[in-house]
């Protein structure tokens, strides 16, 4: 479910929730007076009063539609929680009055003082909605058939609840949706109450214009963008025009700001082609055009629009000292200096949201190599900047005078003689782990795509296991299966439960996501409703239409073409968009056939083989020893227990690291045929990233890349697929 921006910004105000069971005193947020305008000490104390609610209430803040078990529903809905929340809300209204406002620290929006209480009441009431027969809708949704009627009473109750929420800036649209559904389904429309909105004001930035342009006959978004040297997106944003740039005004004046050299995006352009044509790095292209998303897969949305190919904010130079370039004396060392950053530094930069090494280098005119030299904790790919930490961005004096800078110089000379050229040591990309070395928890899976390490320095006290699993959309059974050191059930328990207190450790990391699809849960998740008619098949994730079409496109990081393809009822111009309807934005193809270029080296593109490897059942072979006995029940295989994956719930193939699955990492190179099926020819597919040599491993079809470099390593980068690539052991370009 798509979350509203006010939900995301409100996270700052909520404290981390203790992992407790049952109803207890629960804090909605440790709010100090700095976030409350005009509040007395008594008002601050009232707002920070704890309520008698279970910790489930805090989890609903992250996912208002999370599935609750019977005990959780009973604690939340049949105890004193709702009464306690209502009492606190009324107490805050009496104590604080109508003039006190709560300021959202992220968006700057002002809310009435009772905002946190109303927000919590909304979540609790939504989770406690019940049919006329007494069944809770939360329980009904968990078991409802996929073809359940959209006119079921629970759908009606959800729409009714949304239509009278005081959290909305304007409930009129939700009321229209509820009225329409009541009419089409033929059920009696319950009256909805109208509450005064909680939102007092939302800040509206006033653009700072460097000049104004008077609109002429025949002007278009593109013509004005080109003549005034601004990006089309910024022209629309500065003047609050249609973000789809489909309706240009016929008269008036336009604010012109952030001028730059512009490039008109053509059909077929990619970020890589634009960078190559204009001599730009990806960091510069992205920082000068922040509306291009991190994957650069929405560039086609800006065809026939201008983008910036020079800095729209102007070039920044490090201030020069009158006596010498740079800084003569070290700057004061900040309290939040990053680990392993030199203190002999002329200037520090405090990292804020949106910073990356590209923008920092651009701002302070420092090369990436020099930045890494002064801040040795930074990885070569510079993806581990810490938020709110200070890094050195300028040396004291000449950086070449720093010990260890540059190559060592011999103090003697030798006469040049003929010598044999030594081959360059290969860059083995797959061995260079891009994460900090934090040991895995005991028995945690070692073949995961993503691990979680809780950094106490900036994140505070560790969270509960349930919150960690919820943050990655994992059910608890799956989370504990991958991280068994946290599981408190007896080994081989017949009916394990997961309601025990559990907190993750800040000293180890945990598996949160596999590199390939995980087994389908026993109980399929029921699609949301109402959904758009005629949506694409195999949809796995939806968003609800809360905002206008253009805003929804931006939030979901989809192009209009893709959104229309997934949801034909929208029509090509999005004129069929309906608020309150769920639209598809992710399918099985998105999950199973992701583009390696999105996750790999920024400077590489995916290499496809002319003979794709099939992973269907017909292309797999199994050893005679791999019989459906001693079948794995926990997803592990081989080893001392000798468990087989054949006919298991996790997949028929046993990977080299001893886990069951059905995709390439399990059935390809290194697959253990003694404990399940393997792809035909998998014994020749590289299990460890090496190729050729005595073993004559091939890279094609391996998880490391299809190209075999001249040095005998698999990969997909230019070093592997270009000069010296060994065609007999893989694909070459």
UniProtKB/Swiss-Prot annotation:
Instruction: Name the Gene Ontology molecular function terms of this record.
Output: chitin binding
SS bond partners: 637-654, 645-660, 653-667, 671-678, 691-708, 699-714, 707-721, 725-732
Task: List the protein's name.
Answer: Non-secreted LysM effector LCP1
Instruction: State where the protein is found.
Output: Secreted; Cell membrane; Vacuole
| Signal sequence bounds | 1-22
Predominantly, its location class is secreted
What family is this protein classified in? Belongs to the secreted LysM effector family.
> Does this UniProt record's set of keywords contain NAD?
no
Instruction: List the glycosylation sites.
Output: 298, 304, 340, 350, 381, 432, 442, 455, 538, 630
This protein's UniProt keywords:
Cell membrane, Chitin-binding, Disulfide bond, Glycoprotein, Membrane, Repeat, Secreted, Signal, Vacuole, Virulence
- Identify the PANTHER family for this entry: AM15, LYSM DOMAIN-CONTAINING PROTEIN-RELATED
Q: Which Pfam family, just one, is annotated for this protein?
A: LysM
Recorded topology in the membrane: Peripheral membrane protein
List the InterPro entries hit by this protein, alphabetically.
Chitin-bd_1, Endochitinase-like_sf, LysM1-like, LysM_dom, LysM_dom_sf
Compositionally biased region (Low complexity): 605-629
Q: Which residues form the LysM domain?
A: 211-256, 261-309, 347-393
Residue ranges annotated for the Chitin-binding type-1 domain, each copy included? 634-680, 688-733
The Gene Ontology CC terms held by the record are: extracellular region; plasma membrane; vacuole
């Amino acid at each position: 479910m798509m979350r509203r921006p006010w939900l995301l910004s409100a996270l700052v105000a909520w404290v981390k929730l203790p992992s407790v069971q049952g109803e207890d005193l629960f804090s909605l947020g440790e709010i100090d007076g700095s976030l409350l305008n005009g509040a007395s000490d008594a008002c601050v104390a009232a707002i920070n009063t704890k309520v008698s609610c279970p910790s489930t209430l805090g989890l609903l803040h992250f996912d208002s539609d999370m599935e609750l078990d019977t005990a959780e529903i009973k604690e939340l809905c049949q105890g004193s929680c709702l009464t306690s929340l209502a009492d606190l809300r009324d107490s805050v209204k009496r104590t604080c009055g109508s003039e006190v406002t709560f300021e959202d620290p992220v968006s700057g929006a002002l809310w009435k003082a009772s905002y946190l209480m109303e927000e919590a009441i909304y979540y609790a009431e939504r989770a406690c909605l019940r049919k006329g027969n007494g069944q809770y809708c939360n329980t009904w949704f968990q078991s409802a058939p996929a073809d359940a009627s959209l006119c079921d009473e629970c759908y009606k109750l959800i729409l009714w609840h949304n239509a009278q929420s005081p959290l909305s800036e304007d409930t009129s649209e939700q009321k229209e949706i509820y009225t329409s559904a009541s009419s089409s389904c033929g059920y009696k429309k319950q009256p909805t109450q109208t509450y005064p909105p909680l939102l007092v004001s939302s800040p509206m930035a006033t653009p700072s214009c460097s000049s104004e342009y008077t609109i002429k006959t025949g002007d278009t978004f593109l013509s004005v963008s080109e003549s005034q040297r601004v990006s089309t997106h910024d022209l629309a944003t500065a003047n609050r025009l249609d973000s789809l740039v489909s309706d240009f005004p016929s008269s008036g004046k336009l604010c012109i700001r952030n001028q730059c050299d512009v490039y008109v995006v053509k059909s077929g352009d990619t970020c890589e082609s634009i960078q190559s044509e204009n001599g730009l790095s990806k960091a510069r292209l992205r920082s000068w055009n922040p509306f291009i998303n991190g994957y650069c897969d929405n560039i086609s949305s800006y065809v026939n629009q201008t983008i910036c190919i020079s800095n729209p904010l102007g070039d920044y130079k490090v201030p020069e000292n009158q006596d010498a370039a740079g800084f003569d004396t070290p700057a004061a060392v900040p309290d939040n200096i990053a680990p392993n950053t030199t203190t002999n530094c002329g200037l520090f930069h405090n990292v804020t949201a949106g910073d990356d090494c590209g923008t920092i280098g651009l701002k302070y005119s420092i090369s990436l190599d020099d930045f890494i030299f002064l801040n040795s904790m930074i990885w070569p790919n510079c993806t581990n900047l810490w938020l709110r930490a200070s890094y050195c961005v300028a040396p004291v004096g000449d950086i070449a005078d720093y010990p260890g800078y540059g190559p060592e110089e011999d103090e003697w000379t030798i006469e040049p003689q003929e010598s044999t050229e030594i081959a360059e040591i290969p860059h083995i990309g797959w061995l260079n782990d891009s994460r900090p070395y934090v040991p895995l928890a005991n028995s945690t899976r070692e073949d995961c795509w993503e691990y979680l390490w809780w950094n106490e320095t900036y994140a505070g006290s560790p969270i509960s296991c349930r919150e960690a699993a919820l943050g990655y959309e994992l059910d608890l059974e799956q989370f504990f299966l991958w991280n068994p050191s946290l599981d408190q059930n007896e080994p081989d328990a017949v009916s394990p439960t997961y309601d025990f207190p559990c907190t993750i450790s800040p000293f180890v990391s945990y598996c949160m996501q596999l590199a390939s699809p995980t087994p389908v849960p026993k109980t399929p998740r029921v699609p949301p409703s109402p959904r758009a008619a005629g949506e694409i098949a195999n949809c796995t994730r939806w968003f609800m239409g809360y905002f206008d079409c253009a805003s929804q496109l931006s939030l979901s990081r989809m192009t209009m073409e893709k959104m229309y393809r997934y949801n034909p009822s929208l029509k090509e111009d999005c004129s069929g968009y309906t608020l309150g309807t769920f639209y598809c934005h992710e399918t099985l193809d998105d999950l199973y056939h992701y583009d390696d270029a999105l996750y790999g080296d920024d400077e590489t593109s995916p290499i496809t083989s002319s003979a794709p490897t099939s992973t269907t059942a017909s292309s797999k072979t199994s050893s005679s020893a791999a019989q459906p006995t001693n079948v794995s029940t926990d997803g592990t295989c081989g080893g001392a227990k000798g468990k087989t994956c054949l006919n298991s719930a996790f997949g028929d193939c046993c990977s080299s690291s001893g886990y069951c699955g059905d995709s390439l990492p399990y059935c390809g190179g290194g697959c253990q045929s003694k404990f399940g099926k393997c792809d035909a020819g998998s014994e020749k597919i590289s299990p460890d990233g090496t190729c050729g040599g005595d073993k004559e491993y091939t890279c094609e079809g391996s998880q490391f890349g299809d190209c075999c470099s001249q040095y005998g390593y698999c990969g997909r980068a230019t070093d592997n697929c270009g000069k010296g690539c060994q065609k007999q052991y893989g694909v070459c370009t």
